Amino acid sequence: MMLEHVLVLSAYLFSIGIYGLITSRNMVRALMCLELILNAVNMNLVTFSDLFDSRQLKGDVFSIFVIAIAAAEAAIGPAIVSSIYRNRKSTRINQSNLLNK
C-alpha cells in the first residue's frame, strides 16, 4: 500500500477514536475508542519505521510494546467497568464519580 493511503487510514481511525472518546458517555464505548486510537498509533509507528529505515526494527518493536499495553488494558478495563457497575449500577461516565464516596 502507498504511504498516503496508510496515513489517511490511520488519521481516520485516530479521528474516529478521539471523537468517540470525547462524546462517549459509556465506559465500554470509551475503552473501544481508546483501542482505536492505539491501533492508529501502531499503524503510524510501523509505517514510518518502514519508510525511514527498513533494516532496523525499532518502530516494529515499539509497536509490539504498545500492543502488549493495549492487551493489558483490554483485560483490566472491562474488569474495572464490571466492578463499577456492581457498585454503582451504571456504566455512564458522568455518574461514576469514585472520589465522592
Curated annotation (Swiss-Prot):
Localization of this protein: Plastid, Chloroplast thylakoid membrane
Family assignment from sequence similarity: Belongs to the complex I subunit 4L family.
Principal subcellular localization: plastid
An annotated Gene Ontology molecular function: quinone binding
Membrane topology annotation: Multi-pass membrane protein
Protein's organism: Nuphar advena (Common spatterdock)
Transmembrane found in the keyword field: yes
Keywords from the UniProt entry: Chloroplast, Membrane, NAD, NADP, Plastid, Plastoquinone, Quinone, Thylakoid, Translocase, Transmembrane, Transmembrane helix, Transport
Oligomeric and partner information: NDH is composed of at least 16 different subunits, 5 of which are encoded in the nucleus.
EC number assigned by the record: 7.1.1.-
Reactions mediated catalytically: a plastoquinone + NADH + (n+1) H(+)(in) = a plastoquinol + NAD(+) + n H(+)(out); a plastoquinone + NADPH + (n+1) H(+)(in) = a plastoquinol + NADP(+) + n H(+)(out)
One Pfam family this sequence matches: Oxidored_q2
Keyword set includes Plastid: yes
Record-given protein name: NAD(P)H-quinone oxidoreductase subunit 4L, chloroplastic
GO cellular component, one term: NADH dehydrogenase complex
